[in-house]
Amino acid sequence: MNNDQSEQCVRTFLDSFYTGDVARMEQCCDDAFVSLTYAPVEIFPHFGLKQGKAWIAQAIQIQQERYSDRRHSIDFVVADDTQAAALVQATMTKRSDSRVVTLNTGEFFSLRDGRIVEHRSLFDSFDLVQQLLGDDLTNEFAARLKNAMRQ
């Protein structure tokens, strides 16, 4: 059975991120907050392991600098007293060229006393790179990978 308080905390966290409300997002988080986004940090240096609430303001600022419009829909949330998970679809418009990118993410949370202690996020970074570049790299990448697997 879903824990309504935990679910609301997760929804507030996600809504606050995409609306840029740092203070509201921080209220959802424990002082020991940690976030880990599984993505290549060489390409996305603002992802990876981040510790502390200071990351929240930085992440929102980076997103707002890069994207003129950020929208999201929460497709699914399941939560109990100590854990929660959500599926989110984000649609963002790049400032540099007005290209619209769509990102599907899996968001996972650990909670303590009704606040988020740990946040983990997964998404298809290869797909995002292709969208950001506006170029389908699948065939080129597949050919290179096929050759590498033969060696």
Regions found by a protein language model. Name each.
Residues 1-27, 31, 139-151:
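Short, low-complexity N-terminal intrinsically disordered segments enriched in polar/charged residues
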Residues 14-17, 25, 41-42, 52-56, ...:
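Proteins with a high burden of low-complexity, intrinsically disordered sequence enriched in S/T/G/P/A and R
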Residues 24, 30-82:
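A solvent-exposed, acidic/Ser-Thr-rich amphipathic alpha-helical stretch
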